[in-house]
């Protein structure tokens, strides 16, 4: 096992995360600060639906999936099982496509996604993305809430054995409102 150390990280502070960054785009610029949000499973705003099948291992996997998925390109679904990344579908135009791609990556790499945990970096705009993951046997699925169809996604989630955890989009989505 090899471990790389980045000595520049030793001088970082929380002030660094609050530093404003500017980036030019055609016709203007983007203004953005760092994203200091860290998922806390004890957060009172965390909504747990159908959490009966969720294990401590699933919740540990969720923390890893969050760390990977929240720092990946937008429109990501990340799969973790037994503390190991098994699928990371990034930059997809549709959440359901990201779900299918993450499962395909896991399968083509020789991993069984049954019992795994999924992190979605935003809400499911339709139930189909959740259903794809639940039908693959995932034990825990996390997504933000904030879609106009959240109720339909919750109804779909209630039909499956997978746990479904959500936090408001404005709380846990680093690029909320982009």
Q: Where are the model-predicted features located?
A:
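ATP-dependent carboxylate/acyl-activation modules
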Residues: 1-178
